[in-house]
Structures are given as C-alpha cells and as structure tokens.
Amino acid sequence: MKTLGEFIVEKQQDFPHATGELTALLSAIKLGAKIIHRDINKAGLVDILGTNGVSNVQGEAQMKLDLYANEKLKAALKARGEVAGIGSEEEDDIVIFEGDRAENAKYVVLMDPLDGSSNIDVNVSVGTIFSIYHRITPIGQPVTLDDFLQPGNRQVAAGYVVYGSSTMLVYTTGCGVHAFTYDPSLGVFCLSHESVHFPPTGNMYSINEGNYIKFPLGVKKYIKYCQEQDATTNRPYTTRYIGSLVADFHRNLLKGGIYIYPSTASHPNGKLRLLYECNPMAFLAEQAGGKASNGKDRILDIKPTELHQRMPFFVGTKAMVEQAEAFMAQYPDEE
C-alpha cells in the first residue's frame, strides 16, 4: 500500500531541482480535503446544511458548506506558506496572502471549494476542484490578478476530491492522472488507481436535458444522435447526470463518456467557470487521454479575461468530444 504522501515524494525524486514546495502545497490540499470529508459526513447532524442567505459574485445562493469548505481550504493553504494567494468561487476577488513567506511564495491556487453543494441536502456526491499555477509577477511582492489570469496550458498541477461512497483525491502534475482513496481508519489517502485513462470508447453522455429547449442547435442534434439506435456504434447511449461536475467527470473518466454544459439562452457564455472548473478538469482530461473544449476551441488554450469568466464545456472520452464538436460545427446556432 502506497500513501499519497509517499507517492508525491517518490515522484518528486524524478525532478532533481525540485524544492519540495509543491509537495507541501499538495499536502495542504490533502489536509483540507480530510477536514471537509469529516464534516460532510455529519452534515445532517450539525447546522451546516442549506443556504446562509447571501449570494456570491455570480449571483448564486451560497450554501453554508460552500463557505465552510472555502474557509478551511484557505486556512490550510495559508498556513503552509507556499501559496501567495488564491482565487475561489466563493470570493468576489483574489485573496492576497500577507507576510514575507507569502510574498516569496511561487504559487497561486484557484479552487471551487465545494462543487455541487446543492446536492448535500439530499446526500448526493459533491467535490472540491483545485488548480495550481506558478505566479508570473516577481517574487518578493504581493501577487496581482495577472498571476491568476493565465491560460490552462500553464497549470503546474490540478485535481479534484470527490466525496461519495468513498472519498477519492485525483490529481495530475502533467505526468499522468493518479487517484487515491481515503482510508478513514488510518487517516491517509492510499493509491488505488495509478495512471488512469479514459476508455477509448464510451456510451454515456452527461447533460441536463431539462434545458434542452435552451441548447444550441448543435447540442440538440448531438443529443438526438446519442439517442438513435445503431449497433455499429453501440447506440443508443445512456444518460447519466448527477448535477455535480466532479461526480459526473469522475464516473465518465472511469467508465467512458462525455460531460456537456453548453451555452444556453439564459447563460449565453456558458455557466461553468473557466479558471477553477473548466481548466483543471481539462488538464486532467488531456492527461488521461481525453479531450476538453468549449465546443470549438481547446479549453487549455483560452486566455482568461476575468476571474469568474464562464465558458461552455465539453469534456470526456476524446472520440465523443470530437463527435460533439463536429455537430457544433455542422449545425451553427439558430438565429
């Protein structure tokens, strides 16, 4: 049995000039995940369910657990001293950590502390998403927004934690995707899936079909394609949609499938956030042999213009994403 800590240190040895700072940063995320895991498991017994009566910068009602997870992760990252600042779904602006250690830190972190938190009340899987970059401003001074507005192809590491029937941490540093299952009796994440890859073909599509009437024509046509009977392509495909990006992505990663959150009439730019949802998942997808785009362009090549920028998102098994892109190109949006 190999723990997450042992695995990270082992991989660090492949890089002679590694300083251990990224290892310490990942350790902070690991600690935050353990704390969130502990408290999610007793969410119905303590007063952390439901909303807190305020909205975030995107106008979405903030769940109590959203804010709780945000504070725990922020505290864990700040305490390690390897992070200069964070960007979070739950923060209106970037959070600049103060002090000499923070100003001399090399990294910034973007995160969705609790993806799918509206599912908590009904005991459905939720997750944490994180993305790590080297800062681009000079060491020795506070970070700026420019440090966070980098394209996804500059990510140093990315990953997610899925809190389900078991808690798993899945991450990449650009050398494959590896998954670790939490053993609560030992208090450690243990390697359970090394070098994870999407299956070459898939037969699941994950999309909220309740919004069908609002979808672009290309997405409507792709859904109909998925529903048609054709033995040569193993259709019709199966619909599986949980409503938590982490949970849907995780299932499709292991089983083969595509996740789509397109633009809609009410969200013409899409709804998922580029920096702390699409980019980290796209990095993981490509490292696992999959693909991620906005229906046309590679997600990791898109230059962000604002912290909470939204983006249509197509991610999963490479062949399925390419098929969906073909429908988007063939059937432009209805006028």
From Swiss-Prot:
Query: Where does this protein reside within or beyond the cell?
Result: Cytoplasm
Give the metabolic or biological pathway. Answer: Carbohydrate biosynthesis; gluconeogenesis
Q: How is the cofactor bound?
A: Binds 2 magnesium ions per subunit.
Which residues bind Mg(2+) 2 per the record?
112, 115, 277
- Reactions mediated catalytically: beta-D-fructose 1,6-bisphosphate + H2O = beta-D-fructose 6-phosphate + phosphate
Cofactor(s) needed by this chain = Mg(2+)
One Gene Ontology cellular component annotation? cytosol
Print the keywords alphabetically: Carbohydrate metabolism, Cytoplasm, Hydrolase, Magnesium, Metal-binding
Summarize subunit and interaction data from the UniProt record for this chain. Answer: Homotetramer.
Family per record: Belongs to the FBPase class 1 family.
Protein name, UniProt field: Fructose-1,6-bisphosphatase class 1
Q: What is the organism lineage in this UniProt record? A: Bacteria, Pseudomonadati, Pseudomonadota, Gammaproteobacteria, Enterobacterales
Q: Which gene encodes it?
A: fbp
